[in-house]
């Protein structure tokens, strides 16, 4: 009798005990994917004005255009040994300087907070355009080093992520897709391989719109500043690559850290990129995988690669898994090294490149055979 009573009393406890793992998982998700991003960005806002940032350069470039001055330094004015804490010359295409005019009208303290909010909104909107609705995916993204680094320095990388995501969403609308690809390629030159995605998927009208809009946009923006800096621009980019390329995380930097000369290291990166383009064109099919390959090639060929560039990896991740999965946690591994310049350390460079390659590889594997997301007409 007592045995039956004991069994009866213990029976209701079994379902309760079984619910503990699920409850613990939900609590962990709320803490690490909900509360942690909020704490990170509260800290960021509190310390925003105490750190030099890319946004300072953008704001100054907009002010220069506003007052009729060139935003570009001369190649000869760049220091032989740049200080990683203060070296941030404006070297973007002039479209970026013209785009910063509205923010340059604001006081710097106001403008930098506005731009931080724009960066965060761009990440959220990009994920939404990619069809992501699971809140845990947003939490994982906002906890990641690439997103935090982008917001922390005031980089335009989240806006590039948004541009690529929108190009995917409107990929079968020639004018919209073309204009969006032109925007990302002219705002940050290393993303030009995204244009090849349009060509490889036979979206020739969109590719033509992108090419025409890119040329018109760059020439129009340069005309707006009186073509200041146009003659020296190639030399400026070359000098910047020689100065800070070896300090970044690019394959070019890895080659330099292993003793290759500048020309040899850059040629090796270009050859590797060309081989990757040929392999992708031959072996891969489907919009998802080809866009992922285009972004991978972009990161492979750029001579300068900073951690915040890697925010574009959320396009392949979202195209592989629209709901939360371990793949969404992969970019958290980039927290192993977010200190900025590498000082030419091959171990640091190789570690970040290996994590990048692994993330792209996992996304490609999980994209295989999936149906395409709906196309916005």
Per-range role (PLM):
Residues 181-198, 302-309:
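Transmembrane helices and adjacent periplasmic/lumenal helix-loop junctions
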């Amino acid at each position: 009798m007592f045995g039956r009573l004991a069994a009866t009393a213990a029976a209701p406890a079994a379902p309760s005990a079984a619910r503990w793992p699920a409850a613990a998982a939900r609590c962990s998700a709320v803490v690490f994917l909900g509360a942690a991003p909020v704490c990170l960005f509260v800290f960021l806002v509190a310390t925003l004005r105490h750190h030099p940032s890319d946004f300072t350069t953008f704001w100054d470039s907009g002010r220069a255009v506003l007052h009729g001055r060139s935003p570009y330094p001369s190649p000869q004015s760049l220091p032989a040994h740049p200080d990683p804490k203060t070296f941030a010359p404006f070297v973007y295409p002039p479209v970026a300087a013209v785009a910063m005019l509205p923010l340059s009208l604001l006081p710097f303290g106001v403008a930098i907070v506005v731009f931080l909010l724009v960066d965060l909104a761009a990440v959220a909107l990009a994920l939404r355009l990619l069809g992501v609705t699971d809140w845990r995916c947003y939490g994982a993204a906002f906890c990641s080093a690439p997103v935090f680094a982008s917001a922390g320095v005031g980089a335009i990388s989240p806006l590039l992520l948004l541009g690529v995501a929108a190009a995917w969403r409107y990929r079968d609308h020639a004018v919209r897709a073309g204009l969006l690809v032109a925007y990302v390629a002219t705002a940050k030159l290393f993303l030009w391989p995204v244009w090849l995605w349009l060509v490889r998927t036979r979206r020739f009208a969109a590719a033509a719109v992108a090419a025409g809009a890119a040329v018109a946009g760059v020439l129009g923006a340069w005309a707006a500043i009186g073509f200041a800096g146009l003659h020296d621009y190639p030399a400026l980019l070359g000098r910047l690559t020689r100065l800070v390329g070896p300090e970044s995380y690019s394959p070019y930097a890895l080659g330099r850290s292993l003793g290759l000369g500048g020309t040899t290291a850059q040629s090796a990166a270009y050859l590797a990129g060309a081989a990757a383009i040929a392999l992708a064109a031959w072996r891969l099919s489907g919009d998802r995988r080809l866009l992922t390959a285009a972004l991978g090639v972009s990161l492979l060929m750029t001579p300068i690669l900073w951690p915040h560039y890697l925010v574009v990896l959320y396009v392949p991740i979202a195209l592989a898994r629209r709901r939360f999965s371990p793949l969404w946690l992969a970019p958290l591994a980039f927290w192993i090294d977010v200190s900025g310049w590498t000082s030419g350390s091959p171990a640091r460079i190789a570690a970040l490149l290996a994590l990048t390659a692994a993330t792209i590889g996992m996304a490609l594997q999980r994209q295989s055979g999936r149906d395409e997301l709906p196309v916005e007409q």
